Amino acid sequence: MAKKSLKVKQAKHQKFGVRNYTRCNNCGRPHAVLKKFGICRLCFRKYAYEGQIPGIRKASW
């Protein structure tokens, strides 16, 4: 329940722009969220390895 309430709190429009923050759409994590994908680095890594994010693959050079 705590994560659901935090997601609702984050979705509200804040009076000051500094108070806005991103939260992972999948797990609700507030830190290390990739804005382009809307998910945190942990979920991004998991989905990338599973091949669920089109165009993303592990780098090798």
UniProtKB/Swiss-Prot annotation:
Q: Which UniProt keywords apply?
A: Metal-binding, Ribonucleoprotein, Ribosomal protein, RNA-binding, rRNA-binding, Zinc
The cofactor binding remark recorded in the entry reads: Binds 1 zinc ion per subunit.
Q: Which Pfam families match?
A: Ribosomal_S14
The record's section on PROSITE patterns has: RIBOSOMAL_S14
Binding of Zn(2+) occurs at 24, 27, 40, 43
Q: Which is one Gene Ontology cellular component term of this protein?
A: small ribosomal subunit
Name the Gene3D superfamilies for this protein.
30s Ribosomal Protein S14, Chain N
Q: Is Coiled coil a UniProt keyword of this protein?
A: no
- Gene Ontology terms for molecular function: rRNA binding; structural constituent of ribosome; zinc ion binding
Essential cofactor(s): Zn(2+)
SUPFAM superfamilies referenced in this protein's UniProt entry, alphabetically: Glucocorticoid receptor-like (DNA-binding domain)
User: Which terms under GO biological process does the entry name?
Assistant: translation
Which HAMAP family does the entry link to? Ribosomal_uS14_2_B
Chain's role: Binds 16S rRNA, required for the assembly of 30S particles and may also be responsible for determining the conformation of the 16S rRNA at the A site.
The entry's family comment says: Belongs to the universal ribosomal protein uS14 family. Zinc-binding uS14 subfamily.
On assembly, the entry states:
Part of the 30S ribosomal subunit. Contacts proteins S3 and S10.
The name on file for this protein is Small ribosomal subunit protein uS14
Q: Top-down, what is the taxonomic lineage of the species of origin?
A: Bacteria, Bacillati, Mycoplasmatota, Mollicutes, Entomoplasmatales
